[in-house]
């Protein structure tokens, strides 16, 4: 039996194909990789059959149940929004706590203005605007609407599987191009903080004392 801490399951969804991976976190390679082509649309019946076939095969292979999955979505419904904030720095001391609090403010601005969106990625844009009098931060948010993800949540719930995270296929492919065999490898790296400018978000239900699981090293 393969322990569920030894692997990650990625499900890639686009209008052109569905693809499911079992990624070995110890050996950093795919143990399983299956796909099915689409005809320019996301069709839930086809996806349901694809999951029925492959979840059974995967659980038989790993001799364990799939409890959660990382969903990679590539679709024109994925939103990419930039928000910037400039704050006076009266103490003349910009430390990580100050930056963290500012990022929480920016995140709250996004939440207030895009209440129907799930944040997939929160990325701090590099800038050379260093000034002791103020802090300027520009952040890109990549998100997806709740209405779009609702059907995937319900579909996987029928298999007793929870979606642990949503990721953007376009964002991942910006690092690897169109080679989808590598998408699970890059998704694993990004999920573990390989982009030091990406803020790693965690649910408050997981940690009561922290909005950030890892803090990027942009200002260190």
Predicted regions mapped to residue ranges:
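Eukaryote-biased detector of low-complexity, proline/serine/threonine-rich segments
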Residues: 66-68
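Nucleotide/phosphate-binding catalytic cleft detector across ATP-hydrolyzing
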Residues: 1-13, 25-31, 35-64, 73-220
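Conserved blade-register residue in beta-propeller folds
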Residues: 20-22
């Amino acid at each position: 039996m393969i322990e569920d801490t030894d692997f990650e399951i990625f499900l890639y969804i686009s209008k052109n194909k569905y693809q499911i991976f079992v990624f070995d976190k110890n050996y950093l390679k795919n143990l399983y990789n299956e796909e099915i082509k689409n005809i320019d649309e996301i069709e839930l019946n086809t996806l349901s059959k694809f999951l029925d076939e492959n979840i059974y095969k995967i659980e038989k292979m790993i001799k364990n149940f799939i409890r959660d999955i990382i969903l990679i979505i590539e679709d024109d419904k994925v939103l990419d929004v930039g928000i910037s904030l400039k704050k006076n720095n009266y103490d003349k001391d910009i430390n990580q706590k100050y930056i963290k609090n500012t990022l929480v403010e920016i995140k709250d601005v996004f939440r207030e203005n895009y209440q129907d969106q799930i944040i997939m990625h929160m990325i701090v844009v590099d800038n050379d605007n260093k000034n002791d009098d103020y802090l300027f931060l520009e952040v890109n948010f990549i998100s997806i609407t709740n209405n779009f993800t609702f059907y995937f949540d319900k579909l996987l719930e029928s298999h007793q599987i929870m979606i642990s995270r949503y990721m953007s296929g376009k964002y991942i492919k910006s690092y690897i191009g169109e080679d989808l065999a590598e998408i699970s490898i890059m998704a694993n790296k990004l999920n573990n903080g390989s982009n030091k400018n990406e803020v790693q978000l965690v649910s408050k239900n997981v940690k009561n004392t922290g909005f950030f699981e890892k803090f990027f090293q942009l200002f260190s």
